[in-house]
Amino acid sequence: MFTQHHAQFPNVSAAIAAFQAGRPVLLLDDDDREDEADIIAAAENITLQTMAMMIRDCSGIVCLCLDEATVDELQLAPMVQNNQARHGTGFTVTIEAAEGITTGVSAQDRITTIDAALRSSAEQRHIVSPGHVFPLRARNGGVLTRRGHTEGSVDLARLAGLRPAAVLCELMNPDGSMARGEQVAVYARQYNLPVLTIEELARYREAMLEREAEPA
């Protein structure tokens, strides 16, 4: 899907292939925004190894990015009624799998919770609140509406032909500071991770829209 654009956008192509193969990607936002890198992965095929990497090398705040329709169907209320976060990140109430977990904190338990959320519907919920996974509401329109890691992760899942759901966690240095610049590049080389910027993803999507608008 969308392979006609891949040659022009090699980083997007590599990220899509990684998502399809169940491998993580490093997604960077704009320098004048958060200026941070998140490890992201498709929710439906995230591996135990990737989840352990997120818990070990990232902030520990494992987030499940979902499209607006899914958040509404699962009736996930906003974490607060008056969101005053600087970038308006769409946190909802936290979640946990209703069954099949122990403390909810381990890598396996968090994957179980994510799987339970993806299996849930308005009629049959397999999750409870509160919990140790933080759902995020991705705005309709993706990175063309909001240039956030939440939207970028869901956009990439869609482009990979997967469910519009992704997992992310902010990459950190061993000393507890945020990883940036060369620190991100070193980490990417160490683990052979594709690196993608939200700017590249936005340009890719804009090019798709332009091509779709061309007369047949």
Curated annotation (Swiss-Prot):
Is Ion transport among the key words of this record? no
Entry GO CC: cytosol
Summarize where D-ribulose 5-phosphate binds, as residue positions.
R33, E34, D38, R146, R147, G148, H149, T150, E170
Query: Residues that bind Mg(2+) 1, according to the entry?
Result: E34
- GO MF assignments: 3,4-dihydroxy-2-butanone-4-phosphate synthase activity; magnesium ion binding; manganese ion binding
Q: Where is this site: Essential for catalytic activity?
A: H132, E170
EC assignment: the record states 4.1.99.12
SUPFAM superfamilies hit by this protein: YrdC/RibB
Cofactor(s) needed by this chain: Mg(2+); Mn(2+)
Give the catalytic activity: D-ribulose 5-phosphate = (2S)-2-hydroxy-3-oxobutyl phosphate + formate + H(+)
**Keywords carried by this UniProt record:** Lyase, Magnesium, Manganese, Metal-binding, Riboflavin biosynthesis
Chain sites annotated for binding Mg(2+) 2: E34, H149
What class does this enzyme belong to in the EC scheme? lyase
Name its GO BP terms in alphabetical order. riboflavin biosynthetic process
Pathway field: Cofactor biosynthesis; riboflavin biosynthesis; 2-hydroxy-3-oxobutyl phosphate from D-ribulose 5-phosphate: step 1/1
Q: How is the cofactor bound?
A: Binds 2 divalent metal cations per subunit. Magnesium or manganese.
Q: Family per UniProt? A: Belongs to the DHBP synthase family.
According to the record's subunit comment, the protein's assembly and interactions are: Homodimer.
What is its biological role? Catalyzes the conversion of D-ribulose 5-phosphate to formate and 3,4-dihydroxy-2-butanone 4-phosphate.
Protein name per the record: 3,4-dihydroxy-2-butanone 4-phosphate synthase
Organism name: Pseudomonas putida (strain ATCC 47054 / DSM 6125 / CFBP 8728 / NCIMB 11950 / KT2440)
What phylogenetic lineage does the species belong to? Answer: Bacteria, Pseudomonadati, Pseudomonadota, Gammaproteobacteria, Pseudomonadales
